[in-house]
Amino acid sequence: GFLDKLKKGASDFANALVNSIKGT
């Protein structure tokens, strides 16, 4: 559903943000 997609999008965004901060 829409909320599942939204949750996944937020999760992916958070992971990308963490990775960019770590620089790895």
Swiss-Prot record:
Expressed by the skin glands. Its main location: secreted. GO terms for biological process: defense response to bacterium; innate immune response. The keyword Ribosomal protein does not apply. It is found in: Secreted. Keywords: Amphibian defense peptide, Antibiotic, Antimicrobial, Immunity, Innate immunity, Secreted. GO terms for cellular component: extracellular region. Very weak antimicrobial peptide since it does not show activity below 100 ug/ml against Bacillus cereus, Escherichia coli, Leuconostoc mesenteroides, Micrococcus luteus, Pastewella haemolytica, Staphylococcus aureus, Streptococcus faecalis and Streptococcus uberis. Belongs to the frog skin active peptide (FSAP) family. Frenatin subfamily. This is Frenatin-4.
